[in-house]
Amino acid sequence: MPVKVIEGLPAIDELRADNIFVMDNERAKNQNIRPLNLLVVNLMPRKLITDRQILRLLSNTPLQINVDFLFMASHEFKNTKQSHLDSFYKSFSEIKDDYYDGLIITGAPVEQLEFEEVDYWSEFLEIVKWSKSHVYSSLHICWGAQAALYARYEVTKENLPQKLCGIYKSSVEQPKNPLFRGFDDFFNYPQSRYTQSNPSEIKKVPDLEVLSTSKETGFSILAKKNLREVYLFGHLEYDRETLAWEYERDREEGLKPALPKNYFPKDNDKEKPQMSWASAASLFFSNWLNYAVYQGTPYLGERLGHHCGEENYDFNQKE
C-alpha cells in the first residue's frame, strides 16, 4: 500500500527507484479505493481446490476484491459437478459485456495435446481476444501461459524429454521490476509440466521481458513491459500437497512418474512434503494486484473500459 510523506523528503527519489509507492499530501487527499473486480478462468480438474488456492493468494492485501469464476461451456467436466458450476461459476456469454481489473487463467492438464486439439480451444481464443479490450491486467499460469503466448504471438510449445516436476530455484533477473519488489535474489518455484514455450521464439517478441529464469527450467516468468500481461510457467499457487497428489495420480495411471525434485524430505514420498515457496507466492500475487492492477486502473469503475483497450491481434487464423 502507498506511503504518504511530505513532498521534497530526501528519501523519496530513492524509495520510488525501489518501486515503493510514495504519494504527496495532494494525491493522498484525492485517493479513493474501490473494490477490484477479478475474473478467474479455472481450467484445472480439481476446481474446488484450485479456487481455494487462488483465493488464498488474492486475500493477502488490504484491497477488497470481487471475484467471478468462469468455466468453459464448450467442455464437459468429469471432476466437477454441474451443480457446482451452475451455483458458483459463470459462462463467457454471461460476462462478455463486463470489464475486469484483472484476469487469471490457470493451467490445464492438456499440454500434451496440440493447442488446436483442445476441445475448448475456440472458446479460449475468444476469451483471450476479449481480454484485450475488457481486462486491464492478465496473469496466465502454466498451460494458460503457453496457450496465451501462442494465441497472441504465435510462440509454439515443445515437448520436454520428461515431465518437469518438483521445486526449482529461480533467479530474479529484473529486481527493479515491481512484480519482484521485496524478493530475494532467488525463490523456490513449483513446476509440473511436460512442455515449454519455445525460448528462441519468446526472444523475438519485443514487448516481453524475461523476469526470472532457472538453470533447470529455463524461462520461468515473463511479462509485458507495461505489466498488462504476465506469464508464469510454474505453479506458485500450489499448496503443500498438490505435487504429492499429482505424483500419486500419475502412479495410479501407470505412468511411472519420477519423484518430484526437491520436494519430499530425503526423497521419501512417505514423508510430509516441504513447503518452501509460500512467501514468494504471497508476495508475487500481492505485487501483481498492487502494481499491475490497482495502481493502473481508474477509481470510477465505469471508466475501466477506456483503460483496457490495446492493440488488436489476428486470432482468427488460430481457430
Swiss-Prot record:
Site feature location: Important for acyl-CoA specificity: 111
Catalytic reactions on record: L-homoserine + acetyl-CoA = O-acetyl-L-homoserine + CoA
Protein keywords: Acyltransferase, Amino-acid biosynthesis, Cytoplasm, Methionine biosynthesis, Transferase
GO MF, one example: homoserine O-succinyltransferase activity
Protein name, UniProt field: Homoserine O-acetyltransferase
Biological process annotations from GO: L-methionine biosynthetic process from homoserine via O-succinyl-L-homoserine and cystathionine
Cellular compartment(s): Cytoplasm
Residues annotated as the enzyme's active site: 142, 235, 237
Job description of the protein: Transfers an acetyl group from acetyl-CoA to L-homoserine, forming acetyl-L-homoserine.
Top-level lineage group: Bacteria
Alphabetized PANTHER family for the sequence: HOMOSERINE O-SUCCINYLTRANSFERASE
Site (Important for substrate specificity) location in chain: 192
EC numbers for this chain: 2.3.1.31
Pathway in which the depicted protein is active: Amino-acid biosynthesis; L-methionine biosynthesis via de novo pathway; O-acetyl-L-homoserine from L-homoserine: step 1/1
Binding site for substrate: 163, 192, 249
GO cellular component, one term: cytoplasm
Family affiliation: Belongs to the MetA family.
